[in-house]
Amino acid sequence: MKKVYLLAILAFLCADATAQGINFLYNDIRQAFNLARAQRKMVLVEVYSKSCEHCAAFEPVFKEKAVGDFYNQNFINYRLEVSTQDVQRFLTPKKLFAPSLPLFLFFDSNENLQHVAIINSTASELLRKGQEALTPNARTSNFRSRYAAGERGDNFLFDLAMYCRVVCDTAFNIKIMQEYARRTPVAAYSDKTNWLVIQKLLMDADNPMAKYLINNYSVFKTKYNPNEVKFVAENLLMSSLYSSRGARYDAAQIQQIRQGLVKIGIGTESANARTLLPEINYYFSKKQTDKAIARTEDYINNTKPQIADYKYIIGLFNQRATDKTYAPALKKWVNKALTLTTPNSPDAQILKQELAKAQR
């Protein structure tokens, strides 16, 4: 009993003390869970940023009496700022990711994630999501079983896809969004709802909606903020290329990424450079040294590689090529690289050593 009393006093001292509204704790998330166990409550963790305008829009909502009464009665409430050590200490070990801010995470007192919410800044939405967190069947942690049982409503799929993003279940997110894209009319891909879907939920450049975005880029730029459209399209392409899925891409798929980058206004030189390593590594894995040479020649002849670029590529050929047919081309690359440095520089010495390896 004494322990519960002391925890309550400590919570009061650490809380955001307001006459009404949600009482948030700060700075010690472990203390929040200790208090939750003592009071047999769940924990709401709001992940936010001090520089986030959408986060700031929730401030007056948090201060509403009805909101405060509900959350203070049912939850221990904690605010986690994304720039603090709480992210590394709490979210990262649990493999939790914040794809959008603010993010509302509801945990049981043993730190098990039960519910996820990304919502508009209204009291009704905040109260509704809190009530869902208190209702076991409504929690996002139970959505997989509901999906397995056949539930397929649009809003349900959206919530499940976001939950998958938060818990880093990329494979399930891709499956869900492929299903949604297949049943959605193509003519609706660029409407406001699906633009939000593309922005917030898609993780795969191979999704039909992602391909539509790339191939109809001008349509989206006309309807929505051009900078946001470019950011979303570029992120889809690059995150897919350098994901675990991207590591399994064949040459044609990598070339599609390169073409996609050009379509959205990334310069041809930059698109060439960004896709070089994945493509030549694919050729190395297939023992296609000739194609790796040709792709590298394309890069060197059409971009402006620096000395560091030459050193890396030359070293990579020495490490990964399965035959010595690349040696004549490598000699040519070394000679080009040497024009970018002084004869006896450390870089020149490294390049000459790499050439000697290739010629053995």
Predicted regions, residues:
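Bacterial Sec-dependent N-terminal signal peptides
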Residues: 1-23
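Thiol-based oxidoreductase modules, predominantly thioredoxin-like and allied folds used
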Residues: 22-27, 47, 64-88
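A short beta-strand-turn-helix
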Residues: 24-43
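Short active-site neighborhood of thiol/selenol oxidoreductases, capturing the structured segment around
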Residues: 39-52, 315
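Loop/turn elements at helix/coil->beta-strand transitions in domains of secreted/extracellular proteins
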Residues: 39-43, 73-78, 101, 109-112
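Conserved redox-active cysteine motifs that mediate thiol-disulfide chemistry
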Residues: 49-62
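Non-catalytic, surface beta->alpha helical segment in thiol-disulfide oxidoreductase systems
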Residues: 63, 98-142
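Oxidative protein folding and maturation machinery
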Residues: 148-360
